[in-house]
Amino acid sequence: GKPCGVIGTLGATLADDVAAASNTTPDAVSLQQQLAQWLAQGVRAVSMEVSSHALEQGRVNGVEFATAIYTNLSHDHLDYHGSMEAYGRAKLRLFASAGLQHAVINADDPFAVQVRAAVVAGAQVVTYSARGAAADVRVVNAQFQAGGVRGELHSPWGVANFFSPLP
């Protein structure tokens, strides 16, 4: 396999090397330093959790994203954004990024329609649903158990059984 860096709430991780973080998404200078360091180490892919704060503050300006994933809006960040509308606008910035090739969108979330409309022209959109919404990838026959959830994933690429220890 090829090395992949991970940046998020738990810090910046590459294999067993973990650097703690004070923010989900580092400030712009620290982020660019981390990406440059990993590039010098041969890393060609990074999975990054990008907060709405970071989008609003320009912390990821200059970063070209190949894929963006939208999960949901919650009330967690209203203290910063002031309204759900402002929070949503901040999230949309990621999907309007030049160079975006793929957008993965939670069709179960009410804001999904606005996200899909904001996706930059030419990007492939894949939707997913755990609640039966019309989507490209759907959870079917979900069975919630004490140890987690199991079910089937139906998609244009086929059907697969899954088990997740997360409820």
What are these regions (language model features)?
Residues 52-62:
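Switch II of P-loop NTPase G domains
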Residues 2-15, 50-51:
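Short beta-strand-centered segment that lines the nucleotide-binding/catalytic pocket of NTP-utilizing
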Residues 47, 56, 65-167:
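Acidic, Mg2+-coordinating active-site environments of NTP-dependent enzymes
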Residues 16-20, 164-165:
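Short acidic, glycine/proline-rich loop/turn micro-motifs
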Residues 2, 43, 123:
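Short phosphate-binding/catalytic loops that engage adenosine nucleotides
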Residues 19-51:
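Conserved nucleotide-sensing/catalytic segment adjacent to the nucleotide-binding pocket
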